[in-house]
A protein has these predicted regions:
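Conserved catalytic-core motifs of GNAT/GCN5-like acyltransferases
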Residues: 131, 149-163
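Conserved GNAT-fold acetyl-CoA-binding loop/helix
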Residues: 28-48
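A short beta-loop-alpha structural element at the N-terminal edge
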Residues: 6-21
Length: 179
């Protein structure tokens, strides 16, 4: 079986159209798999947010043979995600600096894009947090498979909708600098 070669790079303005296509595919995939409310009703994420992420250097794409097949937000630092300051029904595993992944999506053309992107982000910092909707059983399964621990529930300020909070802590001091 041939190994699929995937690569990660920072997103550029020229990627926005393709990224929006990938998010449209992801919304349809989630709706078809019992998760119509996570991004569907609001056509999340908005293009303006994606452009802001790119300007701030926190937007990444996953490529296969030069074609963008996935995208995600990644940032790393101390208290990088204000929403994660309060967690209900549990506690975070570690209070040190951490990375966070948001808005991860693939176009469905290459198997393993989600795992590759999450593993890449984890490799940058060795301490990663991520959240997802209770209906997103596909993402929950992936996070469990990748060794994440469900730590509790967080509430996103924009919509106060509960999200399942996951964390993975391992070796590394976070000194790796993302692309």
């Amino acid at each position: 079986m041939e190994q699929v070669r995937l690569e990660i790079r920072r997103s550029a303005e020229g990627d926005v159209g393709r990224m929006m296509e990938i998010y449209a595919h992801a919304r349809a995939f989630m709706a078809a798999h019992g998760n119509p409310n996570q991004w569907g009703p609001t056509n999340w994420p908005p293009e303006a947010l994606i452009r802001r992420d790119i300007r701030q250097g926190n937007s990444y794409v996953c490529t296969h043979e030069g074609r963008v097949v996935g995208t995600f937000f990644f940032a790393w630092g101390k208290d990088i995600e204000p929403t994660y300051r309060r967690i209900a029904d549990g506690a975070w595993l570690d209070d040190g600096p951490y990375g966070v992944v948001h808005r991860i999506a693939g176009d469905g053309s290459v198997k393993g894009v989600g795992a590759f992107c999450i593993n890449w982000a984890y490799g940058q910092c060795g301490h990663l947090r991520i959240d997802t909707h209770g209906d997103n059983v596909v993402m929950q399964g992936l996070l469990n498979k990748l060794g994440f621990t469900r730590c509790g529930t967080i509430y996103v300020e924009e919509d106060d909708y509960p999200r399942l909070a996951y964390e993975k802590v391992g070796q590394g001091d976070g000194s790796s600098v993302p692309l």
